[in-house]
Amino acid sequence: VDIGTGFQIEIYLRMGHGTPRSTQCLDAVMQQWVSWAGCPKNIVTDRGMNNRGVFVKEMSAAGVNCVNIGLEAPYQIGKVERHGSMWKTIAAKVIDEKQVRGEQMIMRLTPEINAVVNEMRRNGGFSPAQWVTGRTPRYAAGEQGDDEQAHMLQALEERIDPSTIFAERMEYRHEAKKAFVYADSSSKVAKAMLRKAAPINGDYSTCHNNA
């Protein structure tokens, strides 16, 4: 997650449990972030072993300042934790609704959720994708509803044909949008309710124990 813009990229690493190797994390960051955005000035991570070793060595060699947060102090990367939590909430809903199973389906699902959160989240009136690229990203026909794509009949046919991979991806995206609205609204309602939290008015009695 880019702290300034809120731009978020989640990367599929592998199937199974356990901590991934630092080389896997390095390759993922190089392919999915550095390849198009360049090396960041600073990287702040938790204290997981996957964020050390080769990862730190190579990033430091590229002039990146790598910092680990304190022990048991996830609040130091609170924005990253909140974004990650919302992403997982959206993914869980899509996986449950669309019965996503297997490595190939997860690999198709991940970029669709990335696109949705970077398009629909707002920071200063603009989406993270707009802050980073300077424009609204161009998506598949039928997504933006503009005249430029209205004549793309083949793409629209692919969209409604359940046997195509394209239709599968569009179903993931549509479900992810619904899940994002639900998760984002729930978060905003919770913030509004807790913003000025105070005890409920009432006749409270205080008990004294003189024993």
What residues fall within each predicted segment?
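Generic beta-strand/beta-sheet core signal
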Residues: 1, 14, 45-46, 67-69, ...
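Short amphipathic alpha-helical segments and helix-helix/interface helices
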Residues: 30, 55-56
